[in-house]
Amino acid sequence: MAFFEVKELTKSFDDTEVLKGIDFTLEKGEVLAIIGSSGSGKTTLLRCLNYLETPDTGRITVDGKTYFDAEENKSLSESEIRLRRLHFGLVFQQFNLFPQYTVLDNLTLAARLQRCDELKKMYKEKRLTKVEYKQKKSAVRSEFNEKAAALLEKVGLSEKADFYPCQLSGGQQQRAAIARALALTPDILCFDEPTSALDPELTGEVLSVIKGLKSTDSTMIVVTHEMEFAANVADKIIFMANGIIEECGTPDDIFNHPKSPLLQSFLGKSAYTD
């Protein structure tokens, strides 16, 4: 069994079928690039993987464990969905940093709240004494600040920890958003057009960070319009069209030996050259 499997995933909005039976697998440490024209279903697929949308049918497994099953999902509570969502990190097009918090707090807030909820549950279940609960809770901030500092160093933002998002360039904000997604140690990190909101001169710094993550064996799914990036970084590429996977293969398969007329046309319009 592959590390990550998606089987027969479908999603409709009213009478519009957006995903029409999506199937693919991904091994741990691999990078998958998803390409295709606007409206092909790429972003909806990412949103389904992250429980931001609920698929109508299908099954998703992560490391041999069921992450989503259409029948089982009907009985999941909101808290269970939140826990499952932690398997995936998602970096949006528009950064989505909290403007009222510093870069450091943006990285640590969700993780700190998650840990405090876990400690509270352990205390209520009498697995922690009151003294132990208070001691561990008071240590949460320093613990996650230390982890966040290491992540900021990884994305080249160590000196910006105490800055607010409005004080950063677009590229720096997106790098902070990547670090924030990593802070929750997801099994799979997803990117939805991570450079689409950036000026061309800032695109390179964000793509460089993503390339660096590959060297750490991070498993990633990247929806992108950067064909050169997909060709150089991805282990496999999916081309989506009209809600289906029209073609899937290695970068060499997709860019040098495309079979689908739709893919051939798409690559011609993208002006990609090897």
Across the structure, where does each feature detected by a protein language model lie?
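Helix-to-loop junction immediately C-terminal to a conserved catalytic motif
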Residues: 50
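Conserved signature/switch motifs of ABC ATPase nucleotide-binding domains
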Residues: 163, 184, 216
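Conserved ABC ATPase signature
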Residues: 164-168, 172
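Catalytic Walker B motif of ABC-type/P-loop ATPase nucleotide-binding domains
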Residues: 189-192
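Helix N-cap at the start of a conserved alpha-helix in ABC-type nucleotide-binding domains
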Residues: 200-202
